């Protein structure tokens, strides 16, 4: 019997799975998929601080293996008093479903589950799977999708193609398919000097001067002009701190943080060299630290993006845009495992108070997913 994606969404939303807690969401999905013949593995990874629960479920053992990836964890609700309804009530008003995680991304998971439930499994020449992370939004994401992918490798399980249900749509469901993502790298620059009294600058060395010169040059450096699939890389200064509350003291240190969102014309190493060379031109008294959140990648347009575009056209009548804009997602890990593209609901209210999606959009997304599955396995 086919599943109603709205009812399933309401049930999944009712679990307050604020990252990295689970509160029953993974078990609920596992039990639901088990009823449709999926072999489910609830996988827990973590350390002394946290235990993250994930799910890998598979129907069939053959190739190709079409995998849907998503996450059940959600960001905090903020002030729940400002919500129209209880954030975990899954309330519907005026044909709009409200709740934390509706958009990002519980309803997309439910839409794909519902789409699968409409398929005659006997017609599938291959297998369908779900990779569901319990921590995509928080600080323990390494115990989510990356850990599950390692488990798949260790257990000789192969995914041939992955569709991620992140909210990619802009104005209407299906108008945007993500075929790649920009990389993200954080820099911390520390300039050192000599502390002293502002009245005796010759006895001190103000590191602020060097930092101003460094940041000015970085801000005026054009990293690239973009290319066919990516917008230009951009660098944003996010903080500048001296930790000095006294107005008559020259500080001995200044720290600046910046983030670069970069396209496939760069690597984290090439960007480090650019920033490091700028710092070295200005002063020898600096330290440079980096943290890479994810590398840029692209799944070049081909049969899978064509299938998804065709499914969108059939259901909605619109032509989808292929995009690489926006932030990072777990696709940055999956791309090392298999080809991956992303399609989900509109991202307009993701992470916001009164997060919501029209009921019709969820049904429409379910129809798109179903049509994509049929095309993928050549099912009439």
From Swiss-Prot:
Pathway membership: Amino-acid biosynthesis; L-lysine biosynthesis via DAP pathway; LL-2,6-diaminopimelate from (S)-tetrahydrodipicolinate (succinylase route): step 3/3
Keyword Cell inner membrane found: no
CDD domains according to UniProt: M20_DapE_proteobac (cd03891)
SUPFAM superfamilies referenced in this protein's UniProt entry, alphabetically: Bacterial exopeptidase dimerisation domain (SSF55031), Zn-dependent exopeptidases (SSF53187)
Keywords associated with the record: Amino-acid biosynthesis, Cobalt, Diaminopimelate biosynthesis, Hydrolase, Lysine biosynthesis, Metal-binding, Zinc
Reaction(s) the record says it catalyses: N-succinyl-(2S,6S)-2,6-diaminopimelate + H2O = (2S,6S)-2,6-diaminopimelate + succinate
UniProt cross-references to InterPro entries, sorted A to Z: Bact_exopeptidase_dim_dom, DapE_proteobac, Peptidase_M20, Peptidase_M20_dimer, Peptidase_M20A
Protein name: Succinyl-diaminopimelate desuccinylase
Species: Ehrlichia canis (strain Jake)
